[in-house]
Amino acid sequence: MVSKAKPLMSSDVKSILMSKRANIYFLEHCRVLVNGGRVEYVTDAGKRQLYWNIPIANTSSILLGTGTSLTQAAMRELAKAGVLVGFCGGGGTPLFSAVEMDVEVAWLSPQSEYRSTEYLQAWVRFWFNDKLRLAAAKQLQLQRLNWLPAQWTSRTLRDAGFAVPMDTVQALATQFKSNVANAPDITTLLTDEARLTKALYKLAVQTCGYGDFARAKGGSGTDAANRFLDHGNYLAYGLGATATWVLGLPHGLAVLHGKTRRGGLVFDAADLVKDAIIVPQAFVSAMRGDDEQQFRRQCIEALTRSEALDFIIDQLKAIAIDTARLAQLTETAPGAIKNIALATAFGTEESA
């Protein structure tokens, strides 16, 4: 007697922790559907159709570019597995619509809002206080700088010909840590962030011997490095969106990219890993003559190898808890912290 197969439950496809999932997908010119109980994407090869399996239980996010379609059944299975689905333009560039001219990625959260509110409660406890929000932004920037040197000097990059002396990267990180700690407001912090990124581009160009380079925003760049930077950034946005969803943090509660910018917290979260992983790989791939698929594979492997999603989640958790604790301290003992932002930045509490 053959027993009936049990229906697939959402709990059955979430056995792999979100932070440990290995796959990020960017798909173009294909259809995503359910075939034989599996989520697959279909591509056309002449008169033939090729079906490719998507291991949804080990996937954190999927970006759908131009020429894609998604069936209701596939979306239902992706939701059960807790996979974030984002819609963007070709090559990971921004979307454009008649009502809003700069929509980076439109995200569909995978399931209901019945998630733990621990980190959301901690986040909103400090978010309405300008000084505390600045402190959180500084902590985010400092952790980004702490993580960067090890990634830029990894063995994988050295083997690919991207050999940057640790002392050089460490000195750059130390210089900007001082700038972050002393920034009086968010505007100054954003200015320092732009200077850091520009300095990293310069260092990457010198290391690779890339030649003349000017960063073009919004997908307008025509050279390989610019295209790869745009493309890679959207993979990082996928991780940022996944991390904020896991922790139950709304995308609008940004600490760095503006209180009124839609999806700002996703950009904050992605900033933790963009410079460290995407920038060097973009120039390595550009010099090597990789196509977009090869570059994408290298980026995903680097993000997985460095446990980038784990890192983003851990830092957002730490920011939420640490800054909420400072909020509680200032409520119970006004004036107890002389410089909240500086105290948070260096992990110390200065008494008045």
Where are each of the predicted segments found?
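A positional/architectural concept
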Residues: 7, 14-16, 32-63, 71
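Glycine/small-residue-rich interface belts in oligomeric ring/scaffold proteins
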Residues: 52-120
